[in-house]
Amino acid sequence: MSADERFGTAERERLASDLALRGGRLALEYFHRAHVTSKPDGSLVTDADLAIQERLAAEIARAFPDDAIIGEEAGLSTGPRHALYRWVLDPVDGTNNFARGLPGFSVSIGVLRNGQPFAGAVYDPITRWLFAACAGRGAWLNDRPLRTSRAPLSAGSLISVRTPFEDGVPPFAEDWLRRHRLRRFGSTALQLCYVAMGGLDLVYDHRASLWDLAGAAPVLLEAGGVLTLADGSPMFPVTTARRDHPPVAVLAGNPTSHAQALAEVTASTVSR
């Protein structure tokens, strides 16, 4: 890697964290006073989502004009189709919480390099927790290095499972809800980061979008966690050049809990 490439690497890592912090401060300016509307798919969007995304995208384009940018809101997709670096923005991950004046939302910024998680920052402006990571450089919560637990799934495990299940609750999820303790925080990015810090033991999300995952994926992976599609196949690299990457079912955990859960998902699927 050339000196110029190393400089760009460090600058992207720093910019992701800096923009997550700035986006979080802007989110607080709208908190409890945001204007809420519904998107065609029925999900919510606020004026904060749009304002934060616009601000972040402008700063990224100014700093790295050759990078591509995609975002959750308003069909954002800019930059070269085959760019080496692709920024993935979720300006308010947890809009349902944010719109109701509840905590449990974050600003999530991910950077993919050749479709693989490269750098990420997830900021919770209520707790002032900044989760950040860069490939090969570790993961951090503010100034504290992160490692997942290695605890197996047990009766006391805390797991997160997205609801509702439009086609009925799969048998493995029914079993988990009987055996484990459910926590659903409303921000997929934060939940993956909670696995990275050892707070959550498992996350199953049957409808995760790329912008839900891209900012937190480097944090989880650099902390020693595992993130795959629910069938165990790799989540990355992402080969879709634009924003039309479809929602997917994902499984995230520490190495032990992920292996246990994947075996249960596989057994349940085979037996159906």
Region roles according to the model:
Residues 109-193, 239-272:
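Acidic beta-strand-loop-alpha-helix segment within the catalytic core
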Residues 83-121:
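Glycine-rich active-site/cofactor-binding loop and its immediate structural neighborhood
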Residues 66-68, 181, 201, 226:
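Residue-level detector of anion-binding/catalytic polar loops
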